[in-house]
Amino acid sequence: MTTQVPPSALLPLNPEQLARLQAATTDLTPTQLAWVSGYFWGVLNQQPAALAATPAPAAEMPGITIISASQTGNARRVAEALRDDLLAAKLNVKLVNAGDYKFKQIASEKLLIVVTSTQGEGEPPEEAVALHKFLFSKKAPKLENTAFAVFSLGDSSYEFFCQSGKDFDSKLAELGGERLLDRVDADVEYQAAASEWRARVVDALKSRAPVAAPSQSVATGTVNEIHTSPYSKDAPLAASLSVNQKITGRNSEKDVRHIEIDLGDSGLRYQPGDALGVWYQNDPALVKELVELLWLKGDEPVTVEGKTLPLNEALQWHFELTVNTANIVENYATLTRSETLLPLVGDKAKLQHYAATTPIVDMVRFSPAQLDAEALINLLRPLTPRLYSIASSQAEVENEVHVTVGVVRYDVEGRARAGGASSFLADRVEEEGEVRVFIEHNDNFRLPTNPETPVIMIGPGTGIAPFRAFMQQRAADEAPGKNWLFFGNPHFTEDFLYQVEWQRYVKEGVLTRIDLAWSRDQKEKIYVQDKLREQGAELWRWINDGAHIYVCGDANRMAKDVEQALLEVIAEFGGMDTEAADEFLSELRVERRYQRDVY
């Protein structure tokens, strides 16, 4: 960065302001300067009047565009780190959310980087669905003048590992793009792979990308809004659990908990639509069982991230024990030469099925072997936090955050098993006990900025959580817009989550309509998608009145069934064929009128 000051006549600052700016930035590193540049761009982006008053810059040289397609925040963090690396190398770079990207301009991109995660059964993140559809449609342009690279994040415990990245990579090449680098598919522990890939990208682009002129604003893009907080995924807040209340009935097949966490005077802020990240500890009883099955001792030393820890502590705090993966099964089979597991090696479908139905501890029980402690540690994946849709608004609950947790419980040959994070919150954290948390902001699941806009909320099961936050916010704002909730669960008497609250909102006129689907209260199973079809005419009227549609919950089945029902309603009552209805719903997505938080 140059320290030479342009003539004062060309500056929008007076001498005193310029002196203060120079003093404030003297000791900053290039990466810090890049962040500050992006921060002030974000501040400016929130002030349309100031932005409009700024003279149009001279036509700038084409630079690098990074598209961030994130579901849980990891892809966004990688994209932001790459942006900072490129800015530090004095390269002209723009970072945009996939949901904000004007994808019809993709043909004009010269240097394009895509950082994407995968959700559901190989689908792109919600914010990238429209871009993905466009690239795979007949409207996609040739990209013969575009060089690109793709970094894909995923979880190898799922069958369609990194599928979204594979899709983008193959389609960009098919459209004529030139690969700068081979695609990288990163697993849950992605940091080392991302760091190496970022360095390779910077090296590859240095010879191809224009260096930003000193007078240019190199931070020409940012990811929506700048969130500043001392707490993050890597530096969580030590909060305390204040309420743990079961909100399903005694005879329900589901154990759903309403959890309230006290944030104290931390100043941690969130918005309706955000998620709460929870770092949990594994059950000590599960750790003990696994250690004993392998004939190990809990006090044996192991090395974790350069530190020496007792095996018990390492397993309880640092490694994933409740989710098995095909890679773990394959590696355990190879390591132990298990006669039961070796026949599965090489058969992806069988490995996936075994991993999905057999927890790690039961894999060891069924195929016992003797491993040393370090071999066990090397076999496992690092523990990662779980994300829960926030079920509260700070306009009502202030220094608290609420979540709705479906506790995972099941048996394996008569032995009780449970989900790591859900059982931690439900069973092992005492009242006022410590819970390490952070906020994962989700700018792709937000209430309309206009309080008069109607809202349609579709959230069966624990998918109801963010809509409780929405209603608290709409009530606090005295928003005049209509609100319509679709909720479903097996039984009315046992599974009507937050029933009293919804009844109060209806009585007070905050909740205009509520449609309920109970799948097991009658012979015929009824789901929320059936209620959507049943109310199709009225639903179409709301959509025509500008309503925003929100869907939260299961990505693999519910979200697909709901989307199909919406397409049928649009086609029938909008007088469209299937293709036109799909295009209409895609436009709603681009306009942020159709938003999903699915998992």
UniProtKB/Swiss-Prot annotation:
Flavodoxin-like domain residues: 64-202
Record-listed FAD binding positions: 322, 356, 386-389, 404-406, 410, 419-422, 599
Residues the entry annotates as binding FMN: 70-75, 117-120, 153-162
Coiled-coil regions listed in the entry: none
Alphabetical list of CDD domains matching this protein: SiR
Domain of life: Bacteria
Pathway: Sulfur metabolism; hydrogen sulfide biosynthesis; hydrogen sulfide from sulfite (NADPH route): step 1/1
Keywords for this protein: Amino-acid biosynthesis, Cysteine biosynthesis, Electron transport, FAD, Flavoprotein, FMN, NADP, Oxidoreductase, Transport
Keyword Nucleotide-binding: no
GO cellular component: cytosol
A Pfam short name: NAD_binding_1
Catalytic activity: hydrogen sulfide + 3 NADP(+) + 3 H2O = sulfite + 3 NADPH + 4 H(+)
Cofactor(s) essential for the protein: FAD; FMN
Residues engaged in binding NADP(+): 519-520, 525-529, 561
Record GO biological process: cysteine biosynthetic process; hydrogen sulfide biosynthetic process; sulfate assimilation
Enzyme kind, highest EC tier: oxidoreductase
Record-linked InterPro entries: CysJ (IPR010199), CysJ-like_FAD-binding (IPR003097), CysJ_Proteobact (IPR029758), FAD-bd_FR_type (IPR017927), Flavdoxin-like (IPR001094), Flavodoxin/NO_synth (IPR008254), Flavoprot_Pyr_Nucl_cyt_Rdtase (IPR001709), Flavoprotein-like_sf (IPR029039)
Similarity annotation: Belongs to the NADPH-dependent sulphite reductase flavoprotein subunit CysJ family.
Stated role: Component of the sulfite reductase complex that catalyzes the 6-electron reduction of sulfite to sulfide. This is one of several activities required for the biosynthesis of L-cysteine from sulfate. The flavoprotein component catalyzes the electron flow from NADPH -> FAD -> FMN to the hemoprotein component.
Complex formation: Alpha(8)-beta(8). The alpha component is a flavoprotein, the beta component is a hemoprotein.
Name under which the protein is recorded: Sulfite reductase [NADPH] flavoprotein alpha-component
Lineage, top ranks: Bacteria, Pseudomonadati, Pseudomonadota, Gammaproteobacteria, Enterobacterales
Underlying gene: cysJ
